[in-house]
Swiss-Prot record:
Stretch forming the signal peptide: 1-35
Name assigned to this protein: Protein IDA-LIKE 2
Domain of life (superkingdom): Eukaryota
Biological role stated in the UniProt entry: May be involved in floral abscission.
GO biological process: floral organ abscission
Disulphide connectivity of cysteines: none
Principal subcellular localisation of the protein: secreted
Length: 95
């Protein structure tokens, strides 16, 4: 009887170790396919993909989908037209 118990222990321990090894192997293989395991760290891609059939795609015509690019952004410094002080600004007809 003792040999029978010993065989069942060996068989059950072999099955448990085989089962855990298989689960660990599958887990390691599946982790490689997750998006969090990417090796590429360029998450924020600043250059949009260009379409081959379009000369200029719609994503390059606008800034974040709100402002068209052909309108220039005004400078933050003082302009001659609005911020001149003195008599020169009174007589000057063009900026």
């Amino acid at each position: 009887m003792s040999s029978r118990n010993q065989r069942s222990r060996i068989t059950s321990s072999f099955f448990v170790s085989f089962f855990t090894r298989t689960i660990l192997l599958l887990l390691i293989l599946l982790l490689g396919f997750c998006n969090g395991a990417r090796t590429n760290t360029n998450v924020f891609n600043s250059k949009p993909h260009k379409k081959h059939n379009d000369a200029v795609s719609s994503s390059t015509k606008q800034f974040l989908g709100f402002l068209p690019r052909h309108f220039p952004v005004p400078a933050s410094g003082p302009s001659r037209k609005h911020n001149d002080i003195g008599l020169l600004s009174w007589h000057r007809s063009s900026p």
